[in-house]
Amino acid sequence: MTIGLVLGCAPMTLAQIDPYTRSLLQLGYDQSLSSQGPQSLYAYYYYNNPGLLRTNVALRLAVAPVYFDGEIGFRQLLSPHTDVGIGINGGGYGENYYEVRQGHYFKGESFDGHGGGVSLNLYHLINPAQLIPLNAVVQGGAHYSVYSATDKTDDQFNLPDDHVRTFARAGLRFGGKEPMLYPDLALEVSVWFERQWRLEDGSYGFAADRRAQPTTDLYWLYAGLNYAWTNTGNQFTFALTAGGSENADRLNAWRLGGVLPLAAEFPLTLPGYYYKEISAQRFVHLSAAYVAPLSADHRWQLRLGAASAYVDYLPGFERPGRWHTGAGPDLSFTSRSQVWRVILRYGYGFNALRDGRDGAHSVGLLYQYNFERRKHRHEKAKRTFNAD
C-alpha cells in the first residue's frame, strides 16, 4: 500500500500558473476483490495561492503524509504572456514498482521506490485574445531515485541501481482541467513529447534478466471533455489518450489499470483491473461516463462509466488479446453545503486475467473536501448576519 501514490507517479503539472485559490483534501482507495494485487491509495492536501508575497508570485503545493510536490510560479516573468515555474518534489514510496504479468502480482519481483527532483517550467500563452487558452509548455529537470526491498521481495532479486534521471518535456495544451474530483466543466486537447536520460543505466532482477534503458522517448495525445447540465444534474465525460514510446523499460513504460481518477497527470483507468496491471509500449485508451441525479436536489447521483484500451505490450508482458475493457457504477453523495463529496464505486474488468480466466472485480472509495468553499460559505453567512 502506498500513501502519496498520486504524487510519486506523475508531477501534477498544469499548462499555466493556476490563477485560482484552492484548498482541497483528496482521498482515494481502490481494492481488488479478485485475487490479491497491488493496493492503490492516495491521500493528499492540495493548496494553491495565486497571489503569494507579490501579485505575480504563486505557490502550489500537494502534500501527502510521506511525499510532496510543489511549484513557485512567476506570472509574466519573461513577457506579458510567459510564466515561469520552479518545481520541487520528493519523499518516500512515490516510485514503487509492482510486477504484474498475466494477471498475477509477483511480490518477489516488486520493490519500493523513493526520490526527489527539481524542474524549470515555462508556460507561454499563445492566444491571449481568445476565451479558451492555448499554451506552449516546456519543462526540464532532474530526479534522483533510490530503491529498497519490501518484506516480500525475493532475496535473490537484485534491485535497480540508484540513479539520476534527467528529462525534457514539450507540449501544446488547448484548454485544461481543474485539479478537482470530476469537475463539472472541462475541455482539453493536448499533445506531448518527453525524453528521459538515465545517468546510470544497468541490469537488475534475477541474474540481470532485465535492464533499465539509458534513454527513453515518450509521446502522447490527450483529448477530454466534461460537461454538466446544472439545471438537470446530468453530466457527460469523455476522454481519449493515445501514447507511444521508444526504448521503454519496466520502470518508465506506460502502465494501465485501476480506477483512481487523480492517481496520475493523465490517468489510464481500467475498472476492475489492478493498479498499473498492463505494461505497454503503445496504446489507445478511451473512457466515458454518464451521470444521472437520484434526488431532486442532485446531491445523490449515479455515475455509469466504462474504459477500454488497445495495447501493444511491453516485451515480456504479452497476454492473449490486445483489447482491455472495464465498466461499473458509482454512487455519489454531495453535502448540502457542497463542501465535501464522497463516491463509492464498483468496477468489473471484462478482460482482466485471473487464474487463467477473464473477469475481475474491484471496489473503491473517493472523497474530496473543499476548504475554500467552506470559507466562502462562512464569510457569506457572516455578512448576511451582520446585515440583519
Regions found by a protein language model. Give the residues of each.
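Short glycine-rich, acidic/polar surface loops and turns
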Residues: 287-289, 317, 326-333
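Residue-level signature of outer-membrane beta-barrel architecture
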Residues: 47-49, 72-76, 120-126, 172-176, ...
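Transmembrane beta-strand segments of outer-membrane beta-barrel domains in Gram-negative
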Residues: 21-25, 32, 36, 86-237, ...
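Extracytoplasmic gating/loop element in the C-terminal half of outer-membrane beta-barrel translocons
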Residues: 232-314
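Outer-membrane beta-barrel "beta-signal"
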Residues: 331-335, 340-342, 357-388
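Bacterial N-terminal signal peptides
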Residues: 1-10
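Outer-membrane beta-barrel initiation region
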Residues: 13-97, 166-184, 280, 294-298, ...
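Conserved active-site loop/cleft motifs that coordinate metal ions or position small ligands
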Residues: 301-305, 340-348
